[in-house]
Curated annotation (Swiss-Prot):
Domain of life: Eukaryota
Lineage start: Eukaryota, Cryptophyceae, Pyrenomonadales, Geminigeraceae, Guillardia
SUPFAM superfamilies assigned to the protein according to its UniProt record, in alphabetical order: Tubulin C-terminal domain-like, Tubulin nucleotide-binding domain-like
InterPro entries recorded: Tub_FtsZ_C, Tubulin, Tubulin/FtsZ_GTPase_sf, Tubulin_C, Tubulin_FtsZ_GTPase
Name of the molecule in the record: Tubulin gamma chain, nucleomorph
Primary gene name: tubG
Length: 424
């Protein structure tokens, strides 16, 4: 099957959010407790799963971490059968929450990384799609994942790489002192080597849960569940005739290749079912302004949007997606950029008493997010704070070169958003 996806779960956040993603897929596909097909299970599960010799399905995923703690945590759960420790990259190292140390740990173990990846890839019919769960905050999730996506791009240049990344709290306290350094380097690497990024912010999800009074007690587990669940809803589209690339292409079709950051509206999980579904574009826009997960949609403009609903899958709508991809720049600005656009392409899991509208959005309101990342970075860098510890064995001059080039790349992204906004 040409739609097979290899998933990478990198670092603590990648492991835990990815684990919730797999748990959601297992429930949605009605796999039995031994991970064999249930009575009503779909037959095309090899998009995300591979069938073992014992005729049960296991996730096509590789876990990369420089500590055993979080992997041991999921191996004690009821879903431990999903993972085989011998297939994963688990070391006992300490990155000290440094992107540089995580990145160079990948280089130091390049032969082991190559061996693990190639063994999994050899079992696939084609190597086209990679899905990466990570954080841009810490050393492993940011640094090691940057090495991995660079490795994939260099060795599988025609592949499509999507990252599901957790962004840090940019306005509050953080437990990671080096977070601004890590974020700048990680975003730059994703821009250079990835095709798309679906991003989340923990504090934004926590605020949304509190606002909707879902539960008085918040925890990382609940936030990870929300992230894993929403990604499974989006990716469930791939059980139809869509590939990872054709799903996301409508969101990233614009004259600037590095404007590929999208977010998710998770109204499907949080709001009670409305008596009347919005039918007009204006109503949908107003609704999105109220419940978007990460961005203030009133402060910017849509580049593109995909709607996923509980209505039956309409193949007819696929044509409008493919048409968008071939817009030249002039038609893009005149016909796509200046209007809100939504395409129905999937049937979500029905959940009683809950709304069934989910949106994947590419919006210019992401611009203030990366501007804040640069602002936090400059506050730290102008004092060269903690650089000696952060760099470790890496030469300071080399680190400063990486910082300068990464910052310049992100400033280009900011400039491109500003250029697009000038057309409104």
């Amino acid at each position: 099957m040409n739609n097979e996806i290899l998933t990478l779960q990198v670092g603590k956040t990648g492991i835990l959010t990815g684990n919730e993603f797999w748990k959601s897929l297992v429930r949605e596909k009605n796999l039995l407790s031994d991970f064999s097909l249930g009575k009503n299970s779909p037959t095309n599960d090899n998009v995300f799963f591979e069938e073992s010799n014992e005729s049960f399905f296991i996730p096509r995923t590789i876990i990369f971490d420089l500590s055993e703690r979080d992997f041991n945590y999921i191996m004690k759960s009821n879903y431990s059968k999903m993972y085989d420790k011998n297939r994963h990259f688990i070391l006992n190292k300490n990155t000290g929450n440094s992107w540089l140390k995580g990145y160079y740990e990948g280089i130091s173990n390049c032969n082991l990384v190559d061996n693990i990846l190639r063994k999994r890839i050899e079992k696939m019919n084609s190597v086209k799609y990679f899905n990466v769960f990570n954080s841009i905050n810490g050393g492993t999730g940011a640094g090691l994942s940057s090495y991995l996506i660079e490795y994939i791009r260099n060795n599988y240049p025609k592949s499509f790489i999507n990252c599901c990344s957790i962004f840090p709290d940019l306005y509050g306290n953080t437990q990671v002192t080096f977070q601004p350094y890590n974020s700048v380097l990680s975003i730059a690497w994703q821009g250079l080597y990835c095709d798309s990024n679906i991003f989340f912010q923990n504090h934004a999800i926590e605020n949304l849960l509190t606002k909707n009074q879902i539960n008085n007690e918040l925890s990382f587990r609940k936030v990870n569940y929300i992230i894993g669940k929403t990604i499974s809803i989006i990716m469930n589209t791939l059980n139809h005739n869509f590939t990872l690339e054709t799903l996301i292409s409508p969101l990233i079709v614009n004259p600037y290749l590095n404007l590929f950051f999208s977010t998710i509206n998770i109204d499907i999980l949080l709001s009670k079912l409305r008596k009347k579904r919005p039918s007009m574009i204006e109503n949908k826009t107003n609704q999105l302004n109220e419940i978007s997960m990460n961005l203030d949609l009133k402060s910017g403009n849509y580049l593109s949007s995909i709607e996923l609903s509980n209505r039956n899958f309409y193949k007819l709508f696929a044509n409008s997606i493919y048409d968008k991809i071939f817009y030249d720049q002039t038609r893009f600005y005149s016909q796509l950029l200046n209007q809100y656009d939504s395409v129905i392409i999937n049937n979500n899991v029905k959940k009683e008493n809950y709304s069934s509208l989910t949106y994947l959005l590419n919006h210019t309101s992401f611009n203030p997010v990366i501007k804040k990342i640069i602002q936090n970075f400059e506050l730290l860098k102008k004092r060269n704070a903690f650089l000696e510890y952060y760099c470790g064995e890496i030469l300071l001059d080399e680190a400063n070169t990486l910082f300068r080039e990464s910052k310049d790349y992100i400033l280009d992204i900011i400039n491109n958003y500003d250029n697009i906004l000038s057309y409104y």
